[in-house]
Amino acid sequence: MGGTALNEIVKKVKIAEDVFDFWIHSPSVSKEARPGQFVVIRLHEKGERIPLTVADTKPEEGLFRMVVKVVGKTTHELSLKKEGDTILDVVGPLGNPSEIENYGNVLLVGGGVGIATLYPIAKALKEAGNNITTVLGARTKDYLIMVDEFKEISDVLLVTDDGSAGMKGVVTDAMDKLFRERKFDICWAVGPTIMMKFCTLKAREFGVPIWVSLNPIMVDGTGMCGACRVTVSGQIKFACVDGPEFRGEEVDWDELLKRLAQYREQEKISYERFLKTAGESE
């Protein structure tokens, strides 16, 4: 990779509607990143900083992977980048790694693009000798990602809202079914915040401890700005330095959901302005 620039996009593939799979050249991130960690990127001098999970690494090639869903201005800008383009800043790896050990029977639950966050965790848990069962959920089969990769390392149960792949329903329906069929020692859930809240309630119903990966608003990624604060066991924590993973049963979900909605109108305005400007420049 001698001729590859730092933070260069080496590979980019569209893997679902509005979901893109990137491999980025960063020897330090690829070497140091552990399952559960993330990077903060900035596309250009006037760009905002956004956190994105490290979905996989190839240390021997100096590459790390990001799977990104277009949800706003910056992720849309990133989706327009081409192979050979570079990202101005990539800071990381940040956050605490997942607590990987041999638990026994482990249930992993991924929703939407959260599936990508689960992948390195699943690989590490498999290498630690765990028996893994994975529930992958999406609105329709067209939004399910990385299914074959998970099938290589775990038993997989698919769930879609419309029944176009696997079970018809939501991921907690699959959790209920699996918890009744066998004993699980621990669970991970990664996906939309509302999904993780209900996964936590379902795990608690069956007495199974659960880890969740939180995605609050984040700016600097070092605990300075305080934007990512969450209440865990009645104490203020920063997702960027204390997390991003926390025990689900300890999270104040209603407060987190309220905070996530705080800037939704501003985010919408910013995105609409960007789309208008982008359209005029074409």
Swiss-Prot record:
The lineage of its organism: Bacteria, Thermotogati, Thermotogota, Thermotogae, Thermotogales. GO terms for biological process: pyrimidine nucleotide biosynthetic process. It holds the Pfam family DHODB_Fe-S_bind. This is Dihydroorotate dehydrogenase B (NAD(+)), electron transfer subunit homolog. It comes from the Bacteria. The keyword Electron transport applies. InterPro entries: Cbr1-like_FAD-bd_dom (IPR008333), Cyt_c3_hydrogenase_gsu (IPR012165), Dihydroorotate_DH_Fe-S-bd (IPR019480), FAD-bd_FR_type (IPR017927), FNR_nucleotide-bd (IPR039261), OxRdtase_FAD/NAD-bd (IPR001433), PyrK_electron_transfer (IPR050353), Riboflavin_synthase-like_b-brl (IPR017938). GO terms for molecular function: 2 iron, 2 sulfur cluster binding; flavin adenine dinucleotide binding; metal ion binding; oxidoreductase activity. Residues 2-100 form the FAD-binding FR-type domain. Belongs to the PyrK family. [2Fe-2S] cluster binds at C225, C228, C240. Keywords: 2Fe-2S, Electron transport, FAD, Flavoprotein, Iron, Iron-sulfur, Metal-binding, Transport. Binds 1 [2Fe-2S] cluster per subunit. Binds 1 FAD per subunit. Its cofactor is [2Fe-2S] cluster; FAD.
